[in-house]
């Protein structure tokens, strides 16, 4: 029996060895059934159904391509789909071509309707046909996509657009109007346009200003002098990191209107007032400044305040007359720096519509106007609010600044500067140099003044330009004397954007705004 079992075992070994040929890797011995079940279970577990990917695990490029296809397909109008039904296969293969054709059709359609230049559809078509624009622009309307305007306002805007087109034609087609913007400022009759400078292929901001009948550039200059050349010589000589430049200037004078056209760089960051109110630069003035303002951090107040003082100091060294229009709306923020704008207002003889100094009865020196305006601006940067009186008392300022904890340990330094401006110990208003040497601004590092582009060489101006500066100074002194002669009349604070919109008369001693 033992020999029989041993012989059977030997037979099974011989049969197993005959099933393989040496070390052939393609033929393997049979695997036990239990081991086979374990292997199959592991394979099913490894290659089974996986969970769906979350949004963060999706391929970004695939999502972008899908979104583009969806946008292109939704932008196509119903008429174009019916007319081009036989080209649907080609459109699916090349959606970029069909989208560009639709955008060109929109652009041509918007240009054929000049009265609707400021509408939402026109602005949207501009954005889609200009993919290289690095900023986001959209007209914020009242909900239905159409800005409601009275017939008189529409007629004024159409008149301003026609005047701008006339000036552009006189400039040999250098500029092209992209959009007629809303009233982003408070000056009555002023219009803003987004234009393209064809010479450098760059977008610019063009403003159309109504000139007063007694404009300095035409009243105090000889008839044989060209006002445009003189003003461009003066404005072109003001090269400074904290001065917002005027790139081009022109005049339109005829029997129906009297305008000045100015071209400045386009800046999507807006003004200092836009930063305080956290508003978009292109929102209407009557809407964006009705929100709750916020004070700026102390470090930002120090840096921006020092930059504004450096701009005023530069104008003083160049013999430029006082600014007279210094407020947060005329401080443009560009690359983190404050740049003073609105220099052309004083040269053209434009009066400041709402100027806190003109409501004061104690400012008798013309040089102190910008200093007092800077005090109002400093308070607005720290608190976000505007002063309710032209020259507040220090006791009121101390009580007000206690409600703003973000000022911190610099409250004493801020009160020191405000005290020098509104209640000077010696009765003499401080100069710009005195404010620069205060502890709040003295240690601020100005990297823009270290660059090689900044030059301290004072350019020589022509005799005609110097005569214009003297005429502007005399006109400003005369206007200040006229405002002081009317000091016996009660001061009526100007209206806020909300009051202008609703027609409600402001209450006495209400907070007024400087624009």
From Swiss-Prot:
Residues 1-31, 73-94, 483-503 are annotated as: Disordered. This is Slowpoke-binding protein. It is found in: Cytoplasm. Its main location: cytoplasm. InterPro entries: Kinase-like_dom_sf, SortingNexin/PXDomain-PKLike. One of its GO terms (cellular component) is synapse. Interacts specifically with Slo; which activates Slo activity. Interacts with 14-3-3-zeta when phosphorylated. Forms a heterotetrameric complex containing phosphorylated Slob, Slo and 14-3-3-zeta, which represses Slo activity due to the indirect interaction between Slo and 14-3-3-zeta. Phosphorylated. Phosphorylation of Ser-54 and Ser-79 is required for the interaction with 14-3-3-zeta but not with that of Slo. Residues 191-203 are annotated as: Interaction with Slo. Keywords: Cytoplasm, Phosphoprotein. Regulator of calcium-activated channel Slo. Increases or decreases the voltage sensitivity of Slo, depending on the absence or presence of 14-3-3-zeta in the complex, respectively. PANTHER family: PX SERINE/THREONINE KINASE PXK, SLOWPOKE-BINDING PROTEIN. The modification Phosphoserine is found at residues 54, 79. GO terms for molecular function: protein kinase activity. Gene3D superfamilies: Phosphorylase Kinase, domain 1, Transferase(Phosphotransferase) domain 1. Residues 7-20, 73-82 have a biased composition (Polar residues). Expressed in head. In larval brain, it is expressed in the mushroom body. Also expressed in larval muscles. One of its GO terms (biological process) is response to starvation. Induction: Expressed with a circadian rhythm showing a peak at ZT15 (zeitgeber 15).
């Amino acid at each position: 029996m033992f020999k029989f079992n041993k012989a059977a075992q030997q037979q099974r070994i011989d049969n197993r060895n005959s099933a393989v040929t040496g070390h052939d890797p393609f033929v393997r011995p049979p695997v036990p059934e239990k081991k086979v079940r374990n292997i199959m279970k592991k394979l099913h577990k490894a290659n089974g159904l996986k969970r769906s990917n979350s949004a963060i695990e999706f391929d970004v490029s695939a999502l972008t391509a899908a979104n583009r296809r969806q946008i292109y397909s939704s932008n196509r109008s119903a008429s174009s789909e019916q007319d081009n039904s036989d080209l649907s296969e080609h459109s699916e293969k090349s959606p970029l071509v069909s989208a560009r054709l639709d955008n060109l059709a929109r652009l041509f359609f918007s240009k054929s309707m000049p009265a609707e230049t400021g509408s939402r559809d026109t602005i949207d078509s501009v954005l889609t046909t200009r993919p290289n624009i690095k900023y986001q622009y959209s007209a914020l309307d009242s909900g239905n996509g159409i800005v409601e305007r009275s017939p008189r306002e529409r007629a004024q805007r159409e008149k301003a657009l026609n005047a701008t087109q006339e000036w552009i034609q006189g400039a040999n087609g250098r500029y092209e109007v992209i959009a007629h913007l809303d009233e982003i400022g408070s000056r009555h009759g002023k219009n803003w346009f987004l234009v393209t400078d064809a010479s450098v292929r760059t977008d610019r901001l063009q403003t159309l200003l109504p000139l007063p009948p007694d404009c300095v550039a035409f009243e105090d200059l000889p008839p044989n002098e060209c006002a445009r050349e003189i003003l461009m010589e003066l404005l072109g000589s003001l090269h400074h990191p904290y001065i917002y430049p005027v790139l081009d200037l022109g005049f339109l004078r005829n029997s129906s209107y009297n305008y000045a056209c100015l071209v400045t760089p386009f800046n999507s960051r807006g003004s200092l007032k836009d930063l305080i109110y956290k508003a978009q630069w292109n929102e209407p003035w009557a809407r964006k400044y009705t929100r709750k303002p916020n004070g700026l951090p102390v470090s930002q107040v120090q840096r921006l305040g020092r930059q504004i003082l450096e701009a005023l100091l530069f104008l003083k060294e160049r013999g430029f007359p006082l600014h007279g229009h210094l407020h947060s709306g005329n401080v443009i923020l560009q690359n983190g720096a404050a740049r003073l704008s609105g220099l052309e207002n004083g040269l053209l003889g434009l009066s400041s519509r709402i100027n806190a100094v003109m409501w004061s009865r104690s400012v008798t020196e013309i040089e102190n106007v910008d200093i007092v305006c800077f005090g109002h601006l400093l308070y607005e940067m720290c608190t976000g609010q505007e002063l309710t009186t032209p020259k507040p008392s220090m006791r009121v300022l101390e009580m007000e600044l206690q409600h703003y904890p973000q000022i911190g340990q610099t409250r004493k330094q801020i009160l020191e500067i405000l005290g020098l401006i509104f209640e000077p110990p010696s009765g003499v208003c401080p100069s710009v140099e005195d404010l620069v040497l205060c502890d709040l601004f003295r240690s601020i590092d100005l990297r823009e003044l270290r660059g090689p582009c900044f030059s301290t060489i004072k350019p020589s101006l022509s005799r005609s330009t110097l005569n214009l500066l003297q005429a502007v100074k005399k006109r400003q002194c005369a206007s200040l004397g006229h405002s002081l002669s009317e000091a016996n009349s009660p001061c009526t604070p100007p209206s806020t954007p909300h009051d202008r919109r609703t027609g409600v008369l402001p209450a006495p001693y209400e907070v007024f705004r400087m624009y």
